[in-house]
Swiss-Prot record:
Enzyme class: oxidoreductase
Protein name stated in the entry: N,N-dimethylglycine/sarcosine dehydrogenase
Effects seen without this gene: Disruption mutant loses its ability to grow using DMG as the sole nitrogen source but is still capable of utilizing sarcosine and glycine as the sole nitrogen source.
Stored Pfam families: Oxidored_FMN, Pyr_redox_2
Catalysis: reaction(s): oxidized 2[4Fe-4S]-[ferredoxin] + N,N-dimethylglycine + H2O = reduced 2[4Fe-4S]-[ferredoxin] + sarcosine + formaldehyde + 2 H(+); oxidized 2[4Fe-4S]-[ferredoxin] + sarcosine + H2O = reduced 2[4Fe-4S]-[ferredoxin] + formaldehyde + glycine + 2 H(+)
pH dependence: Optimum pH is 7.0.
Amino acid sequence: MAFDALFKPIEIGNLTIRNRVVSTAHAEVHATDGGMTTERYVKYYEEKAKGGCGLCICGGSSPVSIDSPQAWWSSVNISTDRIIPHFQNLADAVHKHGGKIMIQITHMGRRSRWDGFDWPTLLSPSGIREPVHRSTCKTIEEEEIWRVIDDFAQGARRVKEGGLDGIELSAVHQHLIDQFWSPRVNKREDQWGGSFENRMRFGLEVLKAVRAEVGDDFVVGLRICGDEFHPDGLTHDDMKRIAAYYDATGMVDFFGVVGSGCDTHNTLANVIPNMSYPPEPFLHLAAGVKDVVSVPVIHAQNIKDPNQASRILEGGYVDLVGMTRAHIADPHLIAKIQMDQTDRIRQCVGANYCIDRQYQGLDVLCIQNAATSREYLGLPHEIAPSDGPKRKVVVVGGGPGGMEAARVAAERGHEVTLFEAADQIGGQITLAAKAPQRDQIAGITRWYQLELARLKVDLRLGTRADEATIADLRPDIVVLATGGQPFLSQVPEWGYDEDRERSLVVSTWDILSGAVEPGKNVLIFDSICEFAGVSAADYLADKGATVEIVTDDIKPGAAVGGTTFPTYYRSLYEKEVIMTSDLALHRVYREGDALVAVLENEYTGAQEERVVDQVVVENGVRPDEALYYALKDQSRNKGQVDIEALYAIQPQPALATLDDDADAGFVLFRLGDCTAPRNTHAAIYDALRICKDF
């Protein structure tokens, strides 16, 4: 078959992995309780094993010591024997589906915060401040070094006693082990610093202690960085030397290799490459390490497509491929390949909604798959057909919520008609994909196009549904996903040009859609600070405009996630876009052929002016709810959603009334932005939890 390389089993130590695909270690925020794995945690990994993933490495940055705090992502706490029975439940859930599971263990040293959990004193080889967390730490003392080494050994013991298949020691992204490796962090002059051998000593002693505790048959891997990409950091040649050194000990069963350090905001963006990066941008680093070691090498960074993964393996670059975000988007991707259903794989688009939520201390969710990480609630990845009557379902609006509503209703076996006023489905995704760094987000729409065609949804494009259109179909259920429209009328002072009969300001939608030609000297005012404002700035600068983006927030793009805003800032700085904070757009007026934008400082009230030829405003959207109010009184439930049932992921009570009185009208629901403007995930989540019980 075309994917033979993916399905070839491999030995790691004494462990046989059924295929070459790995879900690598990452944080599973809010899936633990006091550091203990929960039902949510177990179900999340069980779904991946059920879907065919060969190896799951769970527990990104799981601490071995109480002075390596769990940080904001609530990682697994392996510093106590209380974790052992929790591991046993996790191991059983994965093993019964033929998968293998390991956990990443670490001491994060200085790369954490001191002001949470037990308020620890952070440790580092030389007490040098870590910039991203703004944490100043103490220089670790000899006695503490040996205590932490033993903590690693005891953590490994707990993993083994819990029935997991191995551990991955984290020596990447400036955790304590690689802090000792780094001359820019390790300034010691004792046996733990200075020479190469001395800087390697801490990691070596950790390996010795771990092996003494778990024996030679238990799998122990080492995750490393192939190049820190820092002026004073460890280079690729340095890392190959380090890998070869530890490989020669015979105590390492595999290496996980990724590119880039992450102790600055800029380098953090490299670690989990978003859609602006090319495929597998750091594969050459893993391949370089593979050349100097004798054990299997795993690489994971921007490997999202099975054809891409197969090509990497066939080329011999690495031995296993990490497809972590790909499994967040679709935990059944391996099973779909095996069933020759690759076109049904919900492919990751690199939006980084998952990881960016983690860095905000929120649970890890997928922008397009609302069932991921909610398996414990009963939200399904595969929609089962209804065992009730076949219904007529009308969906109005072909954005994210409407596409998901139509898909889920059709999977349930109902007759579904989807109306979309535009000539294509996609809604705001279509706009987002026009921005320079966002084109891959169109993959969400492409997947829905294939699914809706497979399910034979009656797709009526270029058709604006109204009361009569809907009445003609005599539906049982109507779902409104009509979205929203740019909200430009909030401030009348933004102005209206009587002579030209149009607003003095235009929206980011106008710019990205091409409805309005870009100006040459443009001011963008962004009060929302999500993707639209910085995307419009990037787009306009690409078109040759001189651009200033102004916000009344702390910075432009303030709500764009931690792995994503740096790529925008790189681009905007390179294109000489001016970024200004703390100014609100107070007034716009015309002066001859120019526009004058009056800006007001949020803190002092002082005003300043910009003279430009175009003012672009990003002020969010307002619900497009006219059709809802036109239909509300015709519906049997008056358009109301039972919020207790919604939040409990239970069927909507109104659905049970459909067989009571055939003349009582249809059941009406609205979801997504036409209820309250939010985001793509919210619209899809609304649709799944409402429509799964049709």
